[in-house]
Amino acid sequence: MLKDEVLKLKKEKDVVILAHNYQVPEVQDVADFVGDSLGLSRQAAKVKQKTILFCGVHFMAETAAIVSPDKRVLIPDLEAGCSLSDSITVDQLRKWKKEHPDAISVGYVNTTAEIKSELDYCCTSSNAVNVVNAIPREKEILFLPDMFLGSYVAKITGRKNMQIWAGECHVHAGITPDHVEKKLAELKNAEFVIHPECSCTTPMMHDVASGRYKNHQVQILSTEGMMNHVSKSDSQQFVVATETGILYRMRQQNPQKTFIPASESAECEYMKMITLDKVYRSLYDEKYEVKVAKKIADKARLAIERMLSIS
């Protein structure tokens, strides 16, 4: 079996496999660690193995290379990109910063290494609120690139001086209020867990505050926040508004509970480019290595380390 070959090879070559929550089940099954962007960044920094095989999209492998400069980072497919990280270029960011010279720039980890090297702080969906709260309130903030996460953070923190870039994740932007309304009508006892990148987040927050959902519990959480919440909650049925790959891990860890995607079509084609066959080829051929130029990596590391110190 291919799975057995992968497990054998990674042991022989002393390679650690990190996989994002959105990876296909066969890839999650061979990983040493499965998690969100923040959790995997931390694992990359502390694992003892000198080679990391990163099963996720390209910016995640770059982040692993930045936080682990003494390790070799491989990715099974160099073409596994990200519509959100592509929504801002370094030239656009530099121009934006020039227009707001006294502002603090806070960038989602879903950005390229070059973008990170221009930031004051990185953040993830699980710590964005903490990062913004750590910045003096009188300071203007440039938040990029996800407009739905940015709007959520501005609302939670009460910041009136946040400029928000108009980028989006095409998968999360596709999870609309209509998807949620339909599930609310169909599933009277379900609890809703919603990723802050979703386009339904802001209207949902308004409706929760107004008491519109009555007995429905609605939580807005990062993917790892979702994992922790569903395991602790007494609810038996959950509607999950994020990329559908996370449902596999949820069902594995909570077999007695039911998990329903808010949108069955919420699949990231870039995440799904990483297959078990490509993982095997990457291990066997020891490719494709992800390298970040030292000058860019050193600057980007500062923004990431500031984030990790707050988290």
What are these regions (language model features)?
Residues 1-241, 246-311:
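Active-site loop-to-helix "anion-binding N-cap" substructures in soluble metabolic enzymes
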